[in-house]
Amino acid sequence: MALELAVDWRIDNILEAIILMLPAMIANATPVVAGGRRPVDMGVVLPDGRRLLGDGKTIEGLLAGFAAGSAAGVLAALASGNMLLAVHSPAIALGALAGDMAGSFVKRRLGIERGRPAPLLDQLDFYLGALAVSIALGYTWTPRVAVEAAAAVLLLHLAANITAYLLGLKKVPW
């Protein structure tokens, strides 16, 4: 008799989506608090004369975001009973951080300076990175929930940024 393992990795409600994206949201927010001095791009300037990413993406922030996002995933796994999230959360956290760096790359190529707004890109780049990683891990999302989760992440991101600005952790509220 063969042992069959049935795992439902379908994300079909907003609560599941928020729980799965918690490591991404924490990973994305942590570098703001962690700060850092050593830029991830090591000062590389591309042929367009602009930095690859800029001083806002630091090694310290990347490591802190990865650690905090991974830890948040373990806590979310314990709270939700989805122990697989504890295993997947480091990858989801890295996906979020990669998405955020991709957003910075795009902003630099468009000539948007560090700290200047790029509506939607600033709020959803990390979500798209984490979403891509979750799909690569085998999670399936209903289109409705993916859009609802994007809207929820957008609102949570805006609220977190305004709060960080009011607390003096960020220079701008976006």
Curated annotation (Swiss-Prot):
Subcellular location: Cell membrane
Entry keyword annotation includes Acetylation: no
Cofactor(s) listed: Mg(2+)
One Gene Ontology molecular-function label: CDP-2,3-bis-(O-geranylgeranyl)-sn-glycerol synthase activity
Origin species: Aeropyrum pernix (strain ATCC 700893 / DSM 11879 / JCM 9820 / NBRC 100138 / K1)
Lipid bilayer topology: Multi-pass membrane protein
Function, in words: Catalyzes the formation of CDP-2,3-bis-(O-geranylgeranyl)-sn-glycerol (CDP-archaeol) from 2,3-bis-(O-geranylgeranyl)-sn-glycerol 1-phosphate (DGGGP) and CTP. This reaction is the third ether-bond-formation step in the biosynthesis of archaeal membrane lipids.
Designated name of the protein: CDP-archaeol synthase
BP terms from Gene Ontology: glycerophospholipid biosynthetic process
Statement: the UniProt record of this protein carries the keyword Lipid biosynthesis: yes
Reactions listed under catalytic activity: 2,3-bis-O-(geranylgeranyl)-sn-glycerol 1-phosphate + CTP + H(+) = CDP-2,3-bis-O-(geranylgeranyl)-sn-glycerol + diphosphate
Cellular-component GO terms for this entry: plasma membrane
Pfam families from the UniProt entry: CarS-like
EC number: 2.7.7.67
UniProt keyword list: Cell membrane, Lipid biosynthesis, Lipid metabolism, Magnesium, Membrane, Phospholipid biosynthesis, Phospholipid metabolism, Transferase, Transmembrane, Transmembrane helix
Name of the coding gene: carS
Pathway assignment: Membrane lipid metabolism; glycerophospholipid metabolism
EC class: transferase
Family assignment from sequence similarity: Belongs to the CDP-archaeol synthase family.
Annotated TM spans: 14-34, 59-79, 83-103, 118-138, 149-169
